[in-house]
Amino acid sequence: VAKKIIVIIFSVLIFNACSVYSSYYSYYPVEEIKTLAIKGTIKNGDSKNSPLSSISVEDKRNLNGKKHKLTLLNNSIKLVKDGKEYIIPYSNSNNYEDIYIYIYKNGVNIINGDFIAYIGKVKLDTGEIINLPPLHFKKEILVENYNPILDTLNQNTTKKIFDGLIEDYEKRNKY
């Protein structure tokens, strides 16, 4: 009986002691657009120094499960980073419901800091046209803690540690 208790206590300690921190980086506009979800995706989302891969624009009504098609009315967007302007061509040749603007594939390498995107006009499937203002993007970080052993056993152990601007996270964790 004593051996079983020791094994149980030891198992509980091992299962609870194994935790892993994971970080995911992305860019979001400072200004929220009421009807659209806009995000900058990093090429390797768990690496702080990975370049911006793409900017996606999605209709927030998609959250109910039904997809709503968006159309970018411009054939390019403009990015401004550190005073330099970049023109990124856009084509919806794949006929996606959402808008994907490929930044890195078009030779623009944004790794750190913020930037401004001039996306222009977006047409909803209702016919409404939204003229997006210049959007100021900043890099954000999502830090989570989870137990891989318990997650394997279908126990959701993920805890959100931080979700916000990378500058705020770095200030918070400075010793």
Give the positions of each predicted feature.
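Detector for glycine-centered tight turns/loop "hinges" at secondary-structure junctions
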Residues: 27-28, 32, 65-67, 82-86, ...
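Short, solvent-exposed mixed-charge patches
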Residues: 20-21, 173-175
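Bacterial Sec signal peptide processing site at the extreme N-terminus
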Residues: 17-35
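Short, surface-exposed binding/anchoring microloops in extracellular/periplasmic proteins
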Residues: 40-77
